[in-house]
Amino acid sequence: RCHAVDYVVQGEGEEAFYQLISALQNGKDGLQEEIPGVRGRHISGELMGSTEAVEVKDLSTIPFPYVEEDMEDLEHKIIYYESSRGCPFSCQYCLSGNKNTVRFFPQERTFKELQWFIDHKVKQVKFVDRTFNCAPHHHRPMMEFMRDANTETNFHLEMEPELMTEWETQILCETPPGRIQIELGVQSTHKKTLD
């Protein structure tokens, strides 16, 4: 309906957007290429392209979004960071919980990238993970890393209160003040909404 929009990338855009840009740079129409996840209006006015949203199967294929050249402008700033995608819940009103699956970036890579932020004196690393504490095998080693790091960097985590245990309480007590900031994801207090 909006004639100012040529293309829409549905779902996770890393692969589809790259393919679309490559097609356009090579003088091709991104709609004729039938790129999964790309839809738009052809010059004729007809809607064309893929109708399915794309999901990146292997998160390790997604490159680290920050480069050395950016850091001069980003030092002492807030950086958004993702260590997982998806949500284990299926709240009716939420876009993130539509599949009840969570995928994780490789943990070794995550530690390396967090250390990179620390080395570059980032003020805050704001995790955009929907539910940071949804999987103990994933979040506990990272919280230990945050606790033990020699840094002034603050880590902002969105956590589900019902999934917090004595372990999380203990590690927060052992962590230097101001190191970890928790945002509790209270979705609703209305039982009917939650059902």
Region annotations inferred by a language model:
Residues 1-52:
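Glycine-rich beta-alpha loop elements in corrinoid/cobalamin-binding modules
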Residues 31-33, 55, 74, 150:
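A generic structural signal for short, non-catalytic loop/turn and secondary-structure boundary residues
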